[in-house]
């Protein structure tokens, strides 16, 4: 997939607008607030709420854009801090924010214990990114098993026979591979390690999956932002980020072999192909992971972002304001999602979410 200039401009503008709308820095964007759940405010109605959220950096570019547009439409703001899924889960459990965001779904038991509700917000993809001079995006091919061996430290150089065999005609350097991973609790890490656990028995037994894992080797960066920064700085490095960060930073991403055996590149189309098999209707509390999904064109590390809210907050109006923002986003934010290479939720799933709000977030 080649990035069109319009798409990159939209991505850059989304982040800039999200930050300026709230006066925040790179890690914290104030985003427009919300208005109702039990009785959501009408779209376009002027409100004055200011709501706080924190969590996944995966969804930060999209929430920033939604927030700026919602602010322009309603005058409301939300302050969303890009601190990682682990931090978002911790803050919503503590009640220090109005919503948390995580790319790892919580189980029904975890939600019940913490008094939380959970619903999807958008779908995107985790992509391996590399710093190899002269390499174009999508030209380097990595199977899941090979990617696991690289992050296990078994494949140590770019001219290793396993990489060369998978990439005939690609000019590869002789140097050492430097691994870059997340240093914070991360839903991006969860989806990356969950996928590797599905395709590599050795990875599953030695490292496993989680928002934080014991990495065999490498350099840790905070947030998608931190990983992207390190990969850009370190020649011969490889890391993993949400696609928007790869595009924003002009970093070459790899092609990958999916469960159907086909080589695919990351895009909204290949993310949608992976999401097509998702059975949300059978997923209690939307607890569903869609890595390594079937589908001829499915991207293998496709991920869902989830929003978390307290069922019984101290101030019920805060929930109403927060849900009004998400209702607006679902009704008016599809174009923004497409521009930033996310996949907006299908209409049937949005109906399911709104029914869930009515019963679980009164």
Placement of each model-derived feature along the sequence:
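Bacterial N-terminal signal peptides that target proteins for export
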Residues: 1-10
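Flexible loop/hinge segments at secondary-structure junctions
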Residues: 23-362
């Amino acid at each position: 997939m080649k990035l069109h200039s319009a798409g990159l401009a939209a991505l850059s503008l989304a982040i800039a607008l999200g930050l300026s709308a709230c006066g925040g820095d790179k890690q914290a964007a104030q985003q427009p607030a919300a208005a109702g759940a039990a009785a959501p405010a009408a779209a376009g109605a002027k409100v004055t709420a200011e709501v706080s959220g924190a969590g996944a950096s995966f969804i930060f570019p999209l929430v920033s854009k939604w927030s700026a547009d919602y602010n322009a439409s309603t005058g409301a703001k939300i302050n969303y801090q890009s601190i990682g899924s682990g931090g978002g889960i911790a803050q919503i459990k503590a009640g220090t924010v109005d919503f948390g965001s995580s790319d790892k779904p919580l189980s029904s038991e975890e939600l019940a214990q913490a008094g939380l509700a959970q619903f999807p917000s958008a779908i995107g993809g985790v992509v391996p990114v590399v710093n190899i001079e002269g390499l174009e995006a999508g030209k380097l091919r990595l199977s899941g098993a090979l990617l696991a061996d690289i992050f296990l430290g078994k494949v140590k150089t770019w001219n290793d026979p396993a990489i060369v065999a998978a990439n005939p005609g690609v000019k590869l350097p002789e140097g050492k591979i430097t691994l870059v991973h997340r240093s914070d609790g991360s839903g991006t890490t969860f989806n990356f390690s969950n996928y590797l656990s599905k395709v590599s028995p050795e990875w599953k037994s030695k490292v496993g999956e989680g928002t934080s894992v014991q990495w065999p080797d490498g350099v840790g960066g905070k947030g998608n932002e931190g990983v992207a920064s390190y990969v850009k700085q370190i020649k011969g490095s490889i890391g993993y980020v949400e696609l928007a960060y790869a595009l924003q930073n002009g970093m070459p991403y790899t092609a990958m072999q999916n469960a159907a055996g086909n080589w695919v590149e990351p895009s909204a189309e290949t993310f949608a192909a992976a999401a097509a098999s998702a059975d949300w209707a059978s997923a209690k509390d939307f607890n569903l992971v869609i890595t390594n999904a079937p589908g001829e064109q499915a991207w293998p590390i496709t991920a869902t972002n989830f929003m978390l809210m307290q069922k019984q907050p101290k101030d019920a109006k805060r929930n109403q304001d927060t849900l009004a923002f998400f209702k607006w986003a679902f009704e008016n934010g599809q174009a923004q999602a497409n521009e930033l290479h996310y996949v907006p939720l299908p209409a049937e799933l949005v109906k399911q979410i709104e029914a869930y709000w009515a019963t679980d977030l009164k």
